[in-house]
Every structure is written in structure tokens, then in C-alpha cells.
Regions:
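Short, well-formed alpha-helical segments that are part of the catalytic scaffolds
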Residues: 12-25
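Acidic helix N-cap motif at the loop->helix transition within catalytic regions
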Residues: 15-17, 42-50, 62, 74, ...
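Donor-binding/catalytic cores of nucleotide-activated saccharide
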Residues: 68, 89-191, 198-200
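Short beta-strand/loop segment that forms part of the nucleotide-sugar
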Residues: 7, 30-39, 59-64, 89
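Glycine-rich, basic loop-to-helix element that forms the pyrophosphate-binding segment
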Residues: 63-79
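A conserved acidic beta->alpha catalytic loop
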Residues: 22, 37-46, 88
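Short aromatic/hydrophobic "clamp" motif used to bind/position activated sugar donors
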Residues: 84
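Cell-envelope/extracellular polymer assembly enzymes that use nucleotide-activated donors
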Residues: 1-4, 22, 32, 176
């Protein structure tokens, strides 16, 4: 089992080191991390290179600034893992992030795993836990917008993106395709453990 982690980066020098360090520290080591530098004009690339030079699992794509949708698509185009994970450059994960996915996938054979998260605000922290009894309940929650259509709080079997790509130049590009991706999935499960730190500061 191999994971492809896709991280779009645009002028994220304040955050990207912590993000990539959290990937480097994973207890489950069979992954590739594809970082897409979306035309950054700050020092993001210098920080990214620190990882790509020292660890072959980290790869970087440089492109002109085309937006997060195009950046995620560029990562999807070269991803070699069986499972796809999107992480935003200003977020980070726990060191057992991938290990929990691997265990859940092995025990359930799920096409999508939805994970719970911790929201980081300037003056507060909020826990968001996703739980459901079955796949149909999860799909209803996503299609009815009861649950958010984030791309980054899910692990996807790669085949779900064979014929689907993110729209380019659109705001809230996740909302435009993630419900369809989830609808096409066979089995969807949740992890109650909060393994993702979502920076809303």
C-alpha cells in the first residue's frame, strides 16, 4: 500500500516547513509527497528543496501561478500511489496520520476514508469529528452539505480521479467535484481520531 500526498504551495514560507516536517515524521513510511510550487515569489521553494534534496520520497513540480485546482491536477497527473491525499500548505498532520489510514483501509477495504480534524483559530481551537454508521449516511451528509466537501480531509483510492480533475481558476473548487467523487465511491468510512490540523488563523 502506497500513499501519494499532494500539496499545492503558493507563498507559504511561514507554514510549509512545519507541513513538510509533519510528513517526514510519519511512522508509516511508504509514501510519496508531491509538492507543487504554484509560482511562489517568496522563499517557499528554498524550504521545499531542503526536503526534495534529502529524501527521494519528496518531489517538487514548478509551474506558473495557475491556482490550487491546477496545482492539485498536476500532482494527480504524476501520482503513483494507490491512495491519494491532499494537504494544504498551511496545515499539518500527526505523525501517525498515514498509519491510521493504512490500518483502516486494511480492515475495511474502503475507497474513501474521512478523517476528523482540529481547527486552529487565532484565539481558540475547535475539534471536528466525523462519524457515521454506513456509506449511504456519509454520502447523504456530503451531498446535502451537512458535511463540508473539503478535498483535504479525505484519503481516496486513486481510481476515483481517473476521469475527474479539479476545475481551474474557480473558487471553492473542492465543492465542484468532491461530492461527485464521493458518489462514485463504493465504501466510505470515517476515522474519529483528529489527525489533521486545519489552520484557520
Amino acid at each position: 500500500m502506497k500513499f501519494s500526498i499532494i500539496i499545492p504551495v503558493y507563498n507559504a514560507e511561514k507554514y510549509i516547513d512545519k507541513c513538510l516536517a509533519s510528513i517526514l515524521g510519519q511512522t508509516f513510511e511508504n509514501f510519496e509527497c508531491i509538492v507543487i510550487d504554484d509560482g511562489s515569489s517568496d522563499n517557499s521553494n528554498i524550504i521545499i528543496n531542503k526536503y526534495t534534496v534529502n529524501d527521494q520520497r519528496f518531489k517538487v513540480i514548478h509551474q506558473e501561478n495557475m491556482g490550487v485546482g491546477a496545482a492539485r491536477n498536476a500532482g494527480l497527473d504524476i501520482a503513483k500511489g494507490e491512495y491519494i491525499i491532499f494537504i494544504d500548505a498551511d496545515d499539518y498532520v500527526t505523525n501517525d496520520f498515514l498509519e491510521k489510514f493504512a490500518l483502516k483501509i486494511c480492515s475495511t477495504n474502503a475507497d474513501i476514508v474521512i478523517y476528523s480534524l482540529t481547527e486552529l483559530h487565532t484565539d481558540s481551537i475547535r475539534s471536528i469529528v466525523f462519524e457515521a454508521n454506513n456509506t449511504e449516511e456519509i454520502k447523504k451528509n456530503i451531498l446535502a452539505s451537512v458535511w463540508p466537501s473539503y478535498s483535504w480531509n479525505k484519503c481516496y483510492r486513486k481510481y476515483l480521479f481517473e476521469n475527474i480533475r479539479f476545475p481551474v481558476g474557480e473558487i471553492f473548487e473542492d465543492v465542484l467535484i468532491i461530492p461527485e467523487v464521493c458518489l462514485n465511491a463504493g465504501k466510505i468510512v470515517c476515522i474519529a481520531d483528529k489527525t489533521y490540523y486545519y489552520n484557520k488563523q
